[in-house]
Amino acid sequence: MAELMLLTQATPFNAVARVYAPRYRQITLSTYALDAQAQQAPLNLAYADVLAAFRHYATHYNQGRPFFLVGHSQGTNHAQRLLLEAIQGTPMEDLLVAAYLPGQPIPRAFFRDDLIRLPPCERPSQGGCVAFWHTFGEGAQPEEIAQWRQDN
């Protein structure tokens, strides 16, 4: 399954960058049905793998080069935390070209209150920012995503 994910999700970056894709213990889909407190232990376990992989990359492979951070779905959640805990306010922040994080909503409050140095991307030429999006099937009502209402 990991090979399929790399082929379908990481291949577009092969022409412009070296791809470093960590293997990590992912939570199961049923974990999302648990209450927030019950989700924490499995999410923390998965994130610990992601954090260890990023630190290994930063120490052994980055060598001062610019990088993109890419995550999808569950990886988007881990990448948000990684941006906050291991990139923002560190020398790696200056090397971040952009973070591409599709597949999960990111509340405006996250940028306003937590990730204050890495804003949402607003234009294609912007760097040091976070691009995120959702795709929707026909008949969906994306305007109902609460995180992007004006009062959030």
What spans do the regions from the language model cover?
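Active-site catalytic motif of lipid deacylating hydrolases and related acyltransferases
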Residues: 1-66
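Hydrophobic/aromatic beta-strand patches that form the interior of the parallel beta-sheet core
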Residues: 18-23, 68, 97-100, 131
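Active-site-proximal beta-strand/loop segments in catalytic clefts of secreted hydrolases
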Residues: 23-27, 72-73, 101-105, 136
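Short catalytic/ligand-binding loop motif for oxyanion handling, primarily in non-cytosolic enzymes
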Residues: 28-32, 77-78, 109
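Short amphipathic alpha-helical patches
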Residues: 32-36, 81, 106
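Surface cap/lid and interfacial helix-loop subdomains adjacent to catalytic sites
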Residues: 52-63, 84-152
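Gly/Ala-rich beta-loop-alpha elbow adjacent to hydrolase catalytic centers
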Residues: 71-79
